[in-house]
Amino acid sequence: MMGFIGSGLGIAVFLLVFIIFKWINILNEYERGVIFRLGRVLKDAKGPGLVIVMWPIDRMVKISLRTVVHDIPPQDVITRDNVSVKVNAVVYFRVMNPVKSVVEVENYVYATSQLAQTTLRAVLGEADLDDLLSKRESVNVRLQTIIDEHSDPWG
């Protein structure tokens, strides 16, 4: 009888220690944790530092706040004067609102990449080749403005 109680107590202690370790999360300076409690998102992201996640009631998604550098694959674009050009681009972005980046879009990196590709084709298709070559800075500003405007709801 004592062996059964002792082993039951051992299992209970093991489970308690397991649950406590599951609750404790450490987030780096550049990370934030978006916590879902029973499926509903808490309004503010947590971190950096020690974050308590009450498993199995809570679920945490880690989001990096560092700048992401994403290479856009080469795009075939036809300019307004019917010249076919192949362009590639690099997009720099970072998450400003971790909660929105998790809740408002399924995959913010993929969505930003697709938005950048679509915007690149649209903006370059509205310009002449001569304008693309001579006014690169204004084209870049226009691309940045459009991408910022459309990706802002994603955080």
Residue ranges, per PLM feature:
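N-terminal hydrophobic membrane-entry segments
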Residues: 1-155
